[in-house]
Regions:
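Structure-specific nucleic-acid interaction/processing domains
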Residues: 1-141
Length: 142
């Protein structure tokens, strides 16, 4: 398992975790969340389990550019840290967004450069990294 955490992860007691993946060479990072369990649709009358364990042990994030860098530089060039675990989906999603806002993932830049400090290109599925910088007042139409 590549995840580092101040204590042992506890999938039986928690729904998922918020994580930080950091490129050790550039300090560029990614903040995301991962569920320990996924619901399984049961056939009527079945006694099969209602959830199955996710791929959290080997999971390396969902950002395309992060995954490309991991493939190019190797997994050892990255630090995989669990920030905190949460007992339900609502708390998990809330704190994922909380940490993304806390770290200012959409507008932070690497020190001394204009390169984004985070691999995150959007948060909450609604707010995206700007494609261009806002330079002037919007044009007023009559």
């Amino acid at each position: 398992m590549h995840w580092k955490y101040s204590k042992k992860p506890n999938p039986k007691k928690h729904f998922g975790f918020v994580y930080l993946i950091t490129n050790k060479k550039t300090d560029k990072a990614y903040v995301g969340c991962k569920q320990y369990w996924h619901p399984v649709k049961r056939k009527k009358g079945s006694t099969a389990p209602t959830k199955r364990e996710s791929n959290w042990l080997i999971y390396m994030g969902s950002s395309k550019s992060l995954l490309e860098d991991i493939k190019k530089l190797g997994k050892r060039s990255f630090k995989f840290e669990i920030i905190a675990e949460f007992k339900n989906k609502r708390s998990l999603k809330y704190y994922e967004l909380y940490y993304q806002m806390k770290y200012n993932v959409l507008s932070s830049v690497l020190e001394g450069t204009d390169e984004a400090a985070y691999y995150n290109n959007y948060v909450g599925g609604k707010f995206y990294r700007p494609v261009q910088e806002f330079e002037d007042e919007p044009t007023k139409y009559k």
